Curated annotation (Swiss-Prot):
Keywords: Host cell membrane, Host Golgi apparatus, Host membrane, Host-virus interaction, Membrane, Modulation of host NK-cell activity by virus, Signal, Viral immunoevasion. Residues 152-163, 219-238 have a biased composition (Pro residues). One of its GO terms (biological process) is symbiont-mediated perturbation of host natural killer cell mediated immune response. It comes from Human cytomegalovirus (strain Towne) (HHV-5). The keyword Membrane applies. This is Protein UL135. GO terms for cellular component: host cell Golgi apparatus; host cell plasma membrane; membrane.
């Protein structure tokens, strides 16, 4: 509208500009009067009337004498924070029914942000709902109960748990001990290598032995018993000393003088020598001396054994 006035003023038509201004002022006043009439009749805006089953809050503006709808939380805050004085607007709870008109219910909503048990209709709250504040709305209220209009509680409302009962944590299941024997052996830890030191030799595990038969028994090894010392026995046949004649006989047989060289045609002939000529037989006196020496040696050995 302002742009229209400026355009008309620039064109120079002052009479036309004044006419347009008068028409605009008349239409604004007429629209304001119509809004006051509809609000005084208790009709809420289309946005609030479309919400069937919702709760609203309204108050009368003392300056313009208009009933204005407010949010539920804002109205409760006004009641909780401000005392009911004529200067402060008071809240009146409204319930929008099936026909789109507000229904005054004294039991809903309660004061102090508490939602009552709507299954039992009932208890009036501390909110002041005197008909002096909203006389036009109280005339439109019906006599229907809460159970017929409000079928279910608000979606965010949950009943409080009973006092003194707490949830017990579930007990873990008890496992029975296993009876199976596990053949799993933990691996042997490998020692860390040390610096400037030779690693110790690792023990080699022997190869697995073959299983022995069932009826096999190890061989019985005889136990070594201590031996008792036995006395030294004298020889039964004493050895006779070698005679000089036998030694000479062996030397003669090995070193035989050969005056002529051997020829393959002539056979080798050795001179025949008798034993009696080379070594005479031993005498009896020599044999007796040997026997006496042997007897004396045996007697000495026997005496030494007895002394020990």
């Amino acid at each position: 509208m302002v742009w229209i006035w400026l355009g008309v003023g620039l064109l120079g038509g002052t009479g036309l500009a004044s006419l347009v201004l008068a028409i605009s002022l008349f239409t604004q006043r007429r629209g304001r009067k119509r809004s006051d009439e509809t609000s005084s009749r208790g009709r809420l805006p289309a946005a609030a009337s479309d919400k069937r089953g919702a709760c609203a809050c309204c108050y009368r503006n003392p300056k313009e004498d208009v009933v204005e709808p407010l949010d539920l939380e804002l109205g409760l805050m006004r009641v909780a924070t401000h005392p009911p004085t004529p200067q402060v607007p008071r809240c009146t709870s409204l319930y929008i029914g099936e026909d789109g008109l507000p229904i005054d219910k004294p039991e809903f909503p309660p004061a102090r942000f508490e939602i009552p048990d709507v299954s039992t209709p009932g208890t009036p709250t501390s909110i002041d709902r005197s008909p002096s504040h909203c006389s036009s709305l109280s005339s439109l209220s019906s006599s229907t109960s809460v159970d017929t209009v409000l079928h279910q509680p608000p979606p965010s409302w949950k009943p409080p748990p009973p006092p003194g009962r707490k949830k017990r944590p579930p007990t873990p299941p008890v496992r029975a001990p296993t009876t199976r024997l596990s053949s799993h052996r933990p691996p042997t830890p490998i020692p860390a290598p040390r610096k400037n030191l030779s690693t110790p030799p690792t023990k080699k595990t022997p190869p697995p032995t073959k299983p022995k038969p069932v009826g096999w028994t190890p061989p019985v090894t005889p136990r070594p018993f201590p031996k008792t010392p036995t006395p030294q026995k004298p020889p039964r046949n004493p050895r006779l000393p070698r005679t000089v004649g036998l030694e000479n006989l062996s030397k003669v047989g090995l070193s035989c003088p050969c005056p002529r060289p051997r020829t393959p045609t002539e056979p080798t002939t050795l001179p025949i020598v008798s034993v009696s000529e080379l070594a005479p037989p031993p005498r009896w006196s020599d044999i007796e001396e040997l026997l006496e020496q042997a007897v004396q040696s045996v007697m000495k050995d026997a005496e030494s054994m007895q002394m020990t």
